[in-house]
Amino acid sequence: MSEHRVNHEPVFLLASSPWRESSLRVEAFSRRYGRVALLARSARKRQSELRGVLVPFVPVSASWYGSQELKTLHRAEWIGGWPQPQGRALFSGLYVNELMLKLTVREDPLPELYDALAEVMEAVCCKAAYIDDLRRFEWRLLNLLGVAPDLHADGTGGDILADKTYRLMPEEAVMPVCEDADALSHEAGAIVEGQSLIDLREGSFRTAESLQQALKITRLFIRHLLPEGLKSRQVLEQIRQFDRKETARETVPTSDGTASNAV
């Protein structure tokens, strides 16, 4: 079987792990070939040209060859982009990479998904407020994977209307809700306003409530696809719990009985 060669393909590194003594096994997402497994020989050696190039969150130009599932990476170049994310943005970048790693299959070309990945990575690395970008990416990912419901019409054939309430369930059409939404809040699925569905569909969140309901929707579908959960989200939640405990410890009562931050 002849070797298939790919040259100068833009990719994002999703994950890497040591391979034997000095090499790396890399999972990358490419624009034309989807997710690919690459063997970067000697990449862990101090003198390797690949050592400082194979980093996540930024686009890289990669060249590889091979007819097996694990290809051989023979060249990689940084093609410019943006700085590495810092603080909590780092966990957001790891979260996006984990979604890509767990929800995509190897060598399934999805150019639109590559473009969506590039957009959200730039936002996470460069913007102070990027949460709306995360919600847009999650919904585009679910759409491109074919698991998101149609947000133009409900299960009865009617248009999604801003002033109506709807129920969303994985693997089902969006259905209008006639009962009191508060009374249904304990039921399975997500109960959301029509305006929030329109905002999610258009990728433009008009209010904080709309953005919060978008999180409810995307989390519902992601949990359905990944019931075992996501490591990056679990770590971030642990950090948030620690921050809340530290804030509580730093808050002390004043002489008049009110609370005051001690720091």
Swiss-Prot record:
Keyword Nuclease included in the entry's annotation: no
Question: Biased composition, Polar residues: where in the chain?
Answer: 252-263
Its BP terms in the Gene Ontology are: DNA recombination; double-strand break repair
| Keywords, comma-separated and alphabetical | DNA damage, DNA recombination, DNA repair
* A Pfam family that the UniProt record links to this protein: RecO_C
Which stretches of sequence are listed as region Disordered? 243-263
Q: Which GO terms describe its cellular component?
A: bacterial nucleoid
Key word DNA damage present: yes
Per the record, the similarity remark reads: Belongs to the RecO family.
What is this protein for, i.e. what is its function? Involved in DNA repair and RecF pathway recombination.
Name of the protein in its database record = DNA repair protein RecO
Organism field: Neisseria meningitidis serogroup C / serotype 2a (strain ATCC 700532 / DSM 15464 / FAM18)
